[in-house]
């Protein structure tokens, strides 16, 4: 692979508050001859202005980027995951958060960015989920998820019942707080907290783990990624059921 023309630096403005880490990274990469631009995963008014660093629009700049460096925790990478996947741009995480399972570098390792000049990279391909909500045969919501899709009862203090199918037929039902449908990358997240299995992140499986099941016989499932998983909420439960992908806003 040839040397990249552009690297996007994408600091979480609430983690790299004064842009110290991103600015130092930009200095190193500029010294190595890379074209660098600074974009934000989400907007914060005035961020970067005191340093005179222009903030560019991510949706525009990523179209011809070769790499994005995310400064934050796992949540920052998850927030960027859909945009990265749609543009087929790899991400390198520099951990500034409380969790850094997806990050490769810590702030005291920035000099290692100089190794990018050889562009001798090992890129891990991670499986993602294509998530849709279908009502009366019509798709009303669609997204992709790097970690998981969580179907839950929200804050309502009651048990919800969910029926789970594959294209081959009925699989199981869950009575409890909901279910986590996870990728291998997400197996160390909410899925693990429910008692689900930990899977090597580069594997290709779909994990199904009930949340606080009402039955002691409920168990997790590890399925081939070729399956299409259907989760149905009976009519009596539908208004109490919520979907959240990668910890985002509930639908």
Model-flagged regions — what are they?
Residues 1-67, 108-124, 133-143:
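ATP/NTP phosphate-donor binding region
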Residues 79, 84-94, 101:
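Gly/Ser-rich helix-loop-strand patches that form or flank binding pockets
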Residues 117, 200-202, 208-213, 222-234:
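Structural signature of FAD isoalloxazine-binding scaffolds in flavoprotein oxidoreductases
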Residues 151, 156, 167-170, 216-251:
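ATP/nucleoside-binding phosphotransfer catalytic cores, i.e., glycine-rich phosphate-binding loops
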Residues 172-217:
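Gly/Ser/Thr-rich active-site loops/lids in small-molecule metabolic enzymes
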